[in-house]
Amino acid sequence: MTPKFDIDYVLANITEDDKIALLSGSDFWHTHAIPKFNVPPIRTTDGPNGIRGTKFFAGVPAACLPCGTALGATWDRDLLHQAGVLLGKECLAKGAHCWLGPTINMQRSPLGGRGFESFAEDPHLSGIMAKSIILGCESTGVISTVKHYVGNDQEHERRAVDVLVTPRALREIYLRPFQIVARDAHPGALMTSYNKINGKHVVENPAMLDIVRKDWHWDPLIMSDWLGTYTTIDSLNAGLDLEMPGPTRYRGKYIESAMQARLIKQSTISKRARKVLEFVERASRAPVSADETGRDFPEDRALNRTLCANSIVLLKNDGNLLPIPKTVKKIALIGSHVKTPAISGGGSASLEPYYAVSLYDAVVEALPDAEILYEAGAYAHRMLPVIDRMLSNAVIHFYNEPPEKERTLLATEPVVNTAFQLMDYNAPGLNRALFWATLIGEFTPDVSGLWDFGLTVFGTATLFIDDEMVIDNATRQTRGTAFFGKGTVQEVGQKQLTAGQTYKIRIEFGSANTSPMKAIGVVHFGGGAAHLGACLHMDPEQMVANAVRVAAEADYTIVCTGLNRDWESEGFDRPDMDLPPGIDALISSVLDVAADRTVIVNQSGTPVTMPWAHRARGIVQAWYGGNETGHGIADVLFGDVNPSGKLPLSWPADVRHNPTYLNNMSVGGRMLYGEDVYIGYRFYEKVGREVLFPFGHGLSYTTFHVSPEATVSPIVFSSDSPPTATVLVKNTGPMAGAQTLQLYIAAPNSATPRPVKELHGFTKVFLQSGEERSVSIHIDRYATSFWDEIEDMWKSEEGVYQVLIGTSSQEIVSRGEFRVEQTRYWRGV
């Protein structure tokens, strides 16, 4: 148990240097300690879908939960609370007091690189999901850090871009999830975003930080994103408590100089130090492990499997193709995702998982008597798959000198694969600013033939196989998108190899500062990184032909493909909505021979184009499903779980249909949020544009009936007695299942332009076959309100409001109405 300390006593007795030290991290993950006064260091940890601990490189394995959009697709408060509890327990096992999550930025564009981390395109759904997972996490004693406040909705030039957004859109869309969290969850910490809002970086923007503390009366610790502090004076005076990570770049001695010039008040330093101490005192109560450990328990696996299965959205099921009967004799599994599951996106979401269940293994388990045919059909990777199971006796040696000089070995680390990220790695005597490393290992291919090798690096790297240079990614480099946008493109080499023969692999690596490449708008964490991948060289046409052959002879075919961490990651945005090259052609070719018995399973965190959707009878959206990806998908495909997921974002047929199409990247250092409040379904409905699948859509293996008239009581809205909408819902189908009833509010007679309707409530109800239940959804004052830019306040406008209850944004099944008799204004939560 950490000894307690008295905040007032500490502040009254510590030195000025101690106060200043508290205002920045001590290293990559920890706050400063003051041992003399029993003030301990607090450990923070990523990420949005699992708890990595303190090491990007050679980290302790962890539970990997489904990605943010997957969790949002459950529309299930209770499940999100349980997910939060699991994340909290994982933090405790990693010795971490503070979880750097959840992410609640908005998916204004389907191309956003971190779109998979957030819950939804709708601010109400996003806020409620965030509230639930935060309350779960903080019930364990771990502090949650909701992020990124605000406007980090795309990755392009994220540190430099000026997001130009109207006050109304800012309040109604982008701040609203944070406001819900502030009102209902009160998490202990808030992380600022990298970007500017309307001309000034959020981290040093008093108007933005005052909204949190003055408008919402929420007083969390406010920390910067990593290397997201840009000034000393402005950030401190605006209200930034903690600069992360350490060692400091803008505080320390710079604060002393600013205080001497009376540009920062002594009272400001004391105020910020008090907030850090309040955070430390609260966080230190968490019963964290002394060491970083794992906790891979059966009940956690079961929960993760439930989360994955309940997130899966049945997009299309013509002729009840699904579920596939377990009596099937021969089934074809096609797609590179079948054996290599996409369990998470990239960037801060990256971690070393306890395990990952592939769809192939799950199908073998579910169908012990079936003949299973497998073909990759087409590769979905952007970078060649990392070498792991065919690698042995691999280590990395670290030096302060390059290979051509006499050098001293400083450290040796064992590795299990050929990818490493060294941003937070250190060793005694290592010069973090400039060092070199050599990875050596033994590679034993399982197939003879010509092998492709791909090497991507942040720094410099050269690949040797049996001392023959195969790839040079050091002398000439081309910028790519890997490693938070700092890496090179993948350089490819080839070598003829024999199955079963062992080859010596050697990578000569130079740290980040050995690279001549520089970039604007990306975060330079230092250290460097490399990714070596390999696979047997294949003829794309032959791969498709092999897939078509097995599909033609199988009773059922599952094509499982999509995106992965190569395509969706922190550090870059997608250039388009397309699936990887060759995937659409593969799917179309399979449908040519087996459309009546083929189901397409897509794994992605955000929408992809589906030019073949009209031909497919069955389409399943499986997101990034975490450790239990394969089990979760199989549970739905074979009917062990009745799908209940609903899309948390609209699915456009074409990226050009999206309202952000002309404004989704930094141009001249700024990005215009020209769609204003018309994000996602709000836009598509306002302009009457069809989508491939609407917001809130998701099918079931059973059917439901909802009473067509919603009872709304009281009929007159008042702040003392807000109305509730009640309907009867009945499971009229053959099996138990869940339906999510979505409450939308329309203000058809408003004098102010408003969306056709907006989500302001939902509930998920589980019913046995034949069961009927009365379901109520509460309506709060924000359901009738918009941000009045003239008055600079919320405005609840008098008039009649329609209550529309749907099973998606386009399937309205029940209606009612109420009225507001008097216009009201207010600020706050």
UniProtKB/Swiss-Prot annotation:
What are the boundaries of the signal sequence?
none
Q: In which pathway does it act?
A: Glycan metabolism; cellulose degradation
Residues bearing attached sugar chains per UniProt: 13, 304, 473, 602, 627, 664
- The source's superkingdom equals Eukaryota
**What EC number(s) does this enzyme carry?**
3.2.1.21
- Domain PA14, first and last residues per copy: 389-548
The protein's location, in the record's own words, is: Secreted
Instruction: State the similarity comment.
Output: Belongs to the glycosyl hydrolase 3 family.
Matching SMART domains: Fn3_like (SM01217), PA14 (SM00758)
Q: What is its main location?
A: secreted
Q: Which Pfam families match?
A: Fn3-like, Glyco_hydro_3, Glyco_hydro_3_C, PA14
Q: Which InterPro entries match?
A: Cellulose_deg_GH3, Fn3-like, Glyco_hydro_3_C, Glyco_hydro_3_C_sf, Glyco_hydro_3_N, Glyco_hydro_3_N_sf, Glycoside_hydrolase_SF, Ig-like_fold
The record, for Gene3D superfamilies, names:
Galactose-binding domain-like (2.60.120.260), Glycoside hydrolase family 3 C-terminal domain (3.40.50.1700), Glycoside hydrolase, family 3, N-terminal domain (3.20.20.300), Immunoglobulins (2.60.40.10)
SUPFAM superfamilies according to UniProt: (Trans)glycosidases, Anthrax protective antigen, Beta-D-glucan exohydrolase, C-terminal domain
Organism listed in the record: Aspergillus fumigatus (strain ATCC MYA-4609 / CBS 101355 / FGSC A1100 / Af293)
Catalyses: Hydrolysis of terminal, non-reducing beta-D-glucosyl residues with release of beta-D-glucose
Q: Which GO terms describe its biological process?
A: cellulose catabolic process; glucan catabolic process
Supply the alphabetized keyword list: Carbohydrate metabolism, Cellulose degradation, Glycoprotein, Glycosidase, Hydrolase, Polysaccharide degradation, Secreted
Any one Gene Ontology MF annotation carried by this entry is: beta-glucosidase activity
Identify the enzyme class.
hydrolase
- Function text: Beta-glucosidases are one of a number of cellulolytic enzymes involved in the degradation of cellulosic biomass. Catalyzes the last step releasing glucose from the inhibitory cellobiose.
Q: Give Gene Ontology CC terms.
A: extracellular region
Q: What is this protein called?
A: Probable beta-glucosidase H
The active site of this protein is located at: 225
